[in-house]
């Protein structure tokens, strides 16, 4: 959520920034929220004046009664003042609801460092690591490799649950588990994150807090007859961990790593990545979440991105980092990097991690602040997160980049201890 004061002080600049995002966004609601805010502030002035008058009348009534006089006229007048205050309170409640409705639907403002552009083709490549994998044979797609090795079962996944569901079996399930353990060990032992195991269901308030709702409700799985949602990412429960709390400045930055299943309806992805395990309704992911002071947050974003890169480097899979342009930025981020791994069957890089700084956008929605000292006024923190990284896409990248001409797949060196010393899946 944006700072309403920021909108009030410079509505035209806010509209310009939102227009630059390329969002399908009705700019007139900025004028609407400014108008509502002005009306609210005028009413608050009136209410304050009425409360002062009520206090004065109350004191005068007490004085008259102590003197044995008749204060009936003042009592009637004070009752009318109280009734007026109640009416204003009703108006204020209605205006506050309207303001909140609008504010929850206004996206974040891009950081000045975000590149111009509207499509993913406008994203700016920052760096690459390793050259794309070359083969002396025609490489297969990961769905064919997994099916041939009997480690991925798409047909039975479809039978049991429907499209975009997959059974991992045998060494496929072992590989997934190995990757999770490797990622968690690396981030906790090498990068200093605290591991946290979150709930897989959250309430509506939590989904609103991180920005999934109200805009993306059609992409969420809601539990029938209840206002719980299956989490689309561990970002939701972990960011809400400190909701309505004031943290100590000396404790920041705080870093968590969380493994969870993730559930997404993929309502806007019809026809995209229909084969394989790149885009599933249920998938596993290791998530990195940080809470930082404003002056720390962009340094922490670089560190978070490097942390996600490190685990991919350990697997020796070619990747690149791109800075996301304004039109591809998403609803909540102020600046975002994508890490994309090389996928031979696609003959291109495919996203495996997004690393974002939300500045105070989420913190205002979930009400997380910090104090440098107990006497200081609380300030909103900055929140950051990134995939550290997606497990299913890692499996796909390993199958494609480590495949051999006989149909087998070599196991990355760093995963061998987690795979019982095995060197190959065949």
UniProtKB/Swiss-Prot annotation:
Catalysed reactions listed for this entry: tRNA(Ser) + L-serine + ATP = L-seryl-tRNA(Ser) + AMP + diphosphate + H(+); tRNA(Sec) + L-serine + ATP = L-seryl-tRNA(Sec) + AMP + diphosphate + H(+)
Compartments reported by the entry: Cytoplasm
Residues at which ATP binds: 264-266, 351-354
PROSITE patterns, sorted: AA_TRNA_LIGASE_II
GO biological process, one term: selenocysteine biosynthetic process
UniProt-listed InterPro entries: aa-tRNA-synt_IIb, aa-tRNA-synth_II, aa-tRNA-synth_II/BPL/LPL, Ser-tRNA-ligase_type_1, Ser-tRNA-synth_1_N, SerRS_1_N_sf, SerRS_core, tRNA-bd_arm
Family the entry assigns: Belongs to the class-II aminoacyl-tRNA synthetase family. Type-1 seryl-tRNA synthetase subfamily.
Subunit description: Homodimer. The tRNA molecule binds across the dimer.
Name used for this protein in its record: Serine--tRNA ligase
Biological classification of the source: Bacteria, Bacillati, Bacillota, Clostridia, Eubacteriales
């Amino acid at each position: 959520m944006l700072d309403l004061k920021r909108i009030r002080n410079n509505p035209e600049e806010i509209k310009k920034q939102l227009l630059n995002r390329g969002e399908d966004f009705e700019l007139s609601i900025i004028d609407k929220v400014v108008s509502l805010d002005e009306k609210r502030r005028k009413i608050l002035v009136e209410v304050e004046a009425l409360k002062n008058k009520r206090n004065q009348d109350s004191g005068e009534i007490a004085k008259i009664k102590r003197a044995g006089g008749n204060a009936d006229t003042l009592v009637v007048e004070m009752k009318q003042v109280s009734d007026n205050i109640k009416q204003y309170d009703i108006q204020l409640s209605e205006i506050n609801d309207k303001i909140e409705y609008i504010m929850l639907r206004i996206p974040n403002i891009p950081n000045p460092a975000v590149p111009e552009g509207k499509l993913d083709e406008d994203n700016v490549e920052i760096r690459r690591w390793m050259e794309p994998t070359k083969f002396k044979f025609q490489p297969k797609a990961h769905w064919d490799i997994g099916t041939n090795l009997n480690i991925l079962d798409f047909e039975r996944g479809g039978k049991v649950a429907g499209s975009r569901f997959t059974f991992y079996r045998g060494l496929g399930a072992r590989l997934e588990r190995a990757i999770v353990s490797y990622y968690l060990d690396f981030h906790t032992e090498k990068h200093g994150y605290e591991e946290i195991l979150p709930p897989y269901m959250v309430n509506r308030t939590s989904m609103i807090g991180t920005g999934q709702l109200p805009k993306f409700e059609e992409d969420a799985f809601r539990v029938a007859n209840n206002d719980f949602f299956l989490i689309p990412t561990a970002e939701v429960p972990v960011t809400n961990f400190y909701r309505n709390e004031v943290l100590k400045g000396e404790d920041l930055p705080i870093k968590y790593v969380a493994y969870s299943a993730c559930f997404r309806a993929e309502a806007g992805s019809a026809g995209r990545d229909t084969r394989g395990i790149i885009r599933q309704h249920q998938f596993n992911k290791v998530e990195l979440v940080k809470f930082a002071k404003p002056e720390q947050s962009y340094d922490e974003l670089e560190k978070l991105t490097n942390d996600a890169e490190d685990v991919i480097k350990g697997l020796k899979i070619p990747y690149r980092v791109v800075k996301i342009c304004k039109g591809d930025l998403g609803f909540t981020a102020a600046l975002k990097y994508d890490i994309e791994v090389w996928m031979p069957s696609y003959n291109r890089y495919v996203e495996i991690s997004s690393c974002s700084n939300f500045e105070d956008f989420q913190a205002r929605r979930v009400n997380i602040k910090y104090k440098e000292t107990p006497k200081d006024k609380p300030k909103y923190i900055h929140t950051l997160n990134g995939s550290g990284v997606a497990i299913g896409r890692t499996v796909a990248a390993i199958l494609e980049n480590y495949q051999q001409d006989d149909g087998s797949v070599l196991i990355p060196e760093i995963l061998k201890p987690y795979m019982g010393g095995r060197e190959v899946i065949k």
